[in-house]
C-alpha cells in the first residue's frame, strides 16, 4: 500500500534488499553514483523537527489532562521529535517509547548506555524494524523519555484488533505499537 501510494504521486520507487540497512546502503550508493540527495528517514535534525510537530498537535488537542504519551520507535525520529517538543513545553507529561520485542534496538541501547546494533530484527512490525537506533535520535531520546516499553507480537496483534473494533480501520503493526505499549503499561501499573 505504501509503495503504491508513493508511485501514485509520480515518484520512481526502487526497492532493494530485505532489510532497512540494505536499502539504506543502496540509496547512499545511488547518491554517490548519480549525485542524488539522500534524506535520512529518521536520523536528520530537520526530519526530527518535522516529526516533532506531532507533539505540537497532541498538546493542542489535549491542552489540560495529558499525563503520558506512548510513541512507537524504529530508528527514533518520531520519538525524538515528539519527546523533545512535549518535554520542552510540558515537562510534567511522561513520555514512553514503545518497541516490538523482536526489534528493540532502543531498549538495548538504553541498557548499554550506547547505541547497539541488533544481529537481526523481526519484520512483523516492519515500519519500525530497525537494527540500530539513530545516532542523533538516541542523543535526544535518552534525555527526553521516561521509559521504554517492549511489546510482543501477540500484544501488537491484540492492539490491531482493538483498533479495528473501535474504528473499523486496520492498523499496520507499527501503527499499533503505541496502543500496545499503553495497554501493557496500564496493566503493569494496575490502572
Residue ranges and their predicted role:
Residues 1-191:
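PLP-dependent amino-acid enzyme catalytic core
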Amino acid at each position: 500500500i505504501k509503495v503504491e501510494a508513493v508511485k501514485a504521486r509520480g515518484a520512481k520507487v526502487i526497492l532493494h534488499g530485505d532489510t532497512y540497512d540494505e536499502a539504506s546502503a543502496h540509496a547512499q550508493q545511488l547518491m554517490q553514483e548519480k549525485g542524488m540527495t539522500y534524506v535520512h528517514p529518521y536520523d536528520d535534525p530537520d526530519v526530527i523537527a518535522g516529526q516533532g510537530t506531532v507533539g505540537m498537535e497532541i498538546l493542542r488537542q489535549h491542552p489540560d489532562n495529558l499525563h503520558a504519551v506512548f510513541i512507537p520507535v524504529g530508528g527514533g525520529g518520531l520519538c525524538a521529535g515528539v519527546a523533545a517538543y512535549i518535554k520542552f513545553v510540558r515537562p510534567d507529561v511522561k513520555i514512553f517509547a514503545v518497541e516490538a520485542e523482536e526489534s528493540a534496538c532502543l531498549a538495548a541501547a538504553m541498557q548499554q548506555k550506547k547505541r547497539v546494533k541488533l544481529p537481526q530484527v523481526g519484520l512483523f512490525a516492519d515500519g519500525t524494524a530497525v537494527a540500530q537506533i539513530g545516532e542523533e535520535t538516541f542523543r535526544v531520546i535518552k534525555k527526553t523519555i521516561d521509559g521504554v516499553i517492549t511489546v510482543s507480537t501477540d500484544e501488537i496483534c491484540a492492539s490491531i484488533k482493538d483498533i479495528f473494533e473501535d474504528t473499523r480501520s486496520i492498523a499496520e503493526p507499527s501503527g499499533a505499537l503505541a496502543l500496545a505499549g499503553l495497554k501493557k503499561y496500564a496493566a503493569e501499573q494496575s490502572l
